């Protein structure tokens, strides 16, 4: 809260820091996992990704990110609505990004993300756990591998390996 202002209203500690590191996930067919003796598996219902381009110059609304495209798509493909989601692990390069992505993925109406986050228990045992491992804001962004930390945490949760922060 007391870190220096970088660009109003953002302060230095509202932004993700660069860090060394990496992360990875191994994906394979179920038959291969069984052959290897892997019993703890996760099966995705839907998948989508998007890379945001030069938003400042090419997007008329700077509060819109690629999540406004992929969020509704993955929910639609999985035949789900935001209210059906048990936890949310969005890319969090800035503190306000979680608010925008909550709106764009259908958890809150546009302009109501801040109130939604204030009114919702976001902890591991809460009504909508968000970035239960702390997200990038807590550990940094290792270059282009940054978004993977949230995916790794989501998979840990789904596999029941969240330890003290395990979502029920």
Identify the residue ranges that each predicted region occupies.
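C-terminal amphipathic "assembly/sorting" segment characterized by alternating charged
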Residues: 144-168
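Conserved active-site "lid/cap" helical segment
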Residues: 17, 66-86, 97, 158-161
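Active-site nucleophile and cofactor-binding loops and adjacent substrate-binding regions
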Residues: 15-19, 89-90, 143-144
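Hydrophobic alpha-helical bundle architecture
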Residues: 78-89, 112-115, 131-140, 159-165
């Amino acid at each position: 809260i007391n870190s220096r202002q970088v660009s109003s209203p953002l302060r230095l500690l509202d932004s993700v820091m660069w860090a060394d590191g990496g992360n990875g996930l191994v994906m394979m067919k179920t038959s291969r996992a069984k052959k290897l003796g892997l019993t703890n598996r996760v099966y995705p219902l839907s998948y989508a990704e998007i890379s945001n381009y030069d938003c400042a110059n090419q997007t008329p609304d700077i509060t819109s990110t690629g999540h406004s495209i992929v969020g509704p798509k993955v929910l639609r493909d999985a035949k789900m609505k935001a209210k059906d989601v048990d936890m949310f692990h969005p890319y969090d390069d800035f503190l306000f990004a979680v608010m925008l992505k909550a709106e764009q993925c259908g958890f809150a109406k546009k302009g109501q993300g801040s109130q939604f986050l204030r009114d919702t228990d976001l902890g591991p045992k809460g009504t909508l756990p968000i970035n239960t491992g702390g997200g990038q804001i807590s550990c940094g962004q290792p270059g282009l591998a940054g978004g993977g930390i949230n995916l790794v945490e989501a998979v840990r949760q789904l596999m029941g390996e969240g330890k003290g922060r395990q979502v029920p």
